[in-house]
Amino acid sequence: MKEKKTKRRVWRGVATTGTSLLALSLSASMVIDTFRTDIDKFLGTQSTQMVTDNQTEDDYTYKSDYSSTTELLDSIEDLGERMSEEGTVLLKNNGALPLSADEKKKVTFLGFSSYFPIQGGDFGSSLVENKGTDADTVDMVQAFEAKGYSLNPTVQQMYEGMKEDFKSEAVLPWGVVTYYRATAPAVGGTFTSLEPSQEKLDKAEPTWKDSMNDYNVMIVTIARAAGENANYTPGEEGVNPEQNLNQADPLGLSDTERATIDAAVKAKAENGGKVIVLLNNASAMEIDELKNNDGIDAMLEVGIPGGYGFYGVADVLSGDANPSGHLADTYAVDNSASPAAQNYGDYEWTNADSDYSINSEIVEAESIYAGYKYYETRYVDTVLGQGNASDSVGSSTGGAWTYNSEVS
């Protein structure tokens, strides 16, 4: 009996030890495999080897077209500049452009977006800055100065001193991101204009209007951001009601933006200068009042230029490049009058679960007739006298629908 008990204890000990070693081995294997790369680096070993048939030395060698990193960065900068030159659209020019060499030396930037422009999307296609490289990304001020423009220092210091007033937030799926520029409202939200009032500007710098006598080429930038998870609700519903800025649509002008343009037009009447409007946006704006404003000498759509595109904008204004771009969207007189705007909104499900970030939908009932397809098709129908196309439904004037009254 004693011998049997001894054997049992031995086997139990062996089994326990074996089980422990097996568990330790499995755990160690998983740990080693997880940190295999670091262990190989430390020991100077190699865990894997890739073997292919007919392998040659250059099979997996990428051959660059550039001889150095500097040359690569210069090429990226050049591409960004040329894209902006070729994509800029000249919407209006009453003999104001191109600017002469003398006019380049007396430029006033107006509008906070001249100093804090939109260069990328709020979420996706956002600006990736290069700093401390051979091709640093530049904003509008830096680009124009690099191209030989002289800017009104009084107005520049005024706007840059108000930087904190231009802080805005973009609501992204993982949280809120802060920008110092215009941002688009979240889906279902309202647009808030950050353009400062004339009273605020006068308080910040009482002499800013007088300073334009010496810098009488006035460039006003109007901006609207864009991005994923952000949209503009058409009509007054999409505008912050607390501001009371006589803004009929988030993509239309606010009274503070109108006042900035009016200040430039008034200064021009006194100093004999020029007024140029730049549209810095990725969403088609309501620009009819800008087009019809005789005080505005030129207007350009510059889009969202990225890290180097403002070099190209500066070249377009001076005539060193031609604005060969064409609009990719229809610029409607009234965005809210189009069929696509009728079903737009943030319509949540009745049984929405707050734990999920997507609880809404939009019913697209207009089929393919969105944007230019709607306007061009309805125009043809008015010419042919069919489909009740001349009816007042969808007319921004309240009268018979006409193409020229609906498209800027």
Predicted regions and their residues:
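C-terminal non-catalytic regions of proteins with extracellular/luminal or membrane-system context
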Residues: M1-S408
